[in-house]
A protein has these predicted regions:
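N-terminal membrane-targeting hydrophobic helices
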Residues: 1-134
Length: 134
């Protein structure tokens, strides 16, 4: 489900645990960006799977990379935000890119365990992660 609060807590925990290696705002933002796809499907009533191509590791990773690239020019604003939150922040394009990809992938991993309509290893149609934790 788009923007589920169940994603934010675990992703924030991972992001904060690796704050020196990850760009926290990009990591968390990429995790949310992946759910723009189901939001559009529901909002516009599109005849498309709720969890479609963006919920695959290849395309989701690419979406995370694009998100990081779009955030790169705004790193000064992100720096001010992190200072306001009293969180350390030092970034680079590489750090942002890796954070975007990993943020998207973690989101897909979480959803793959719960939702039957996800094919995380596209083009393979199976989801071996479905029900893994049940």
């Amino acid at each position: 489900m788009p923007f589920t609060p169940l994603h934010f807590g675990p992703h924030a925990l991972v992001g904060l645990s690796f704050e020196k290696r990850l760009d926290l705002p990009v990591f968390l933002g990429a995790n949310i960006a992946v759910d723009l796809e189901p939001l559009m499907v529901m909002s516009l009533g599109l005849p498309y799977p709720l969890h479609g191509i963006f919920h695959t590791f290849p395309v989701g990773g690419l979406a995370g990379l694009v998100f990081a690239t779009l955030c790169f020019p705004f790193r000064g604003h992100l720096n001010r935000l992190m200072k306001y939150l009293r969180l350390p922040y030092a970034t680079s394009y590489t750090k942002m890119a890796v954070s975007g990809i990993l943020g998207a992938w973690l989101h897909i991993l979480f959803d793959s365990v719960m939702y039957y309509d996800i094919t995380p290893f596209y083009p393979f149609q199976a989801n071996p992660l479905l029900g893994l934790l049940s």
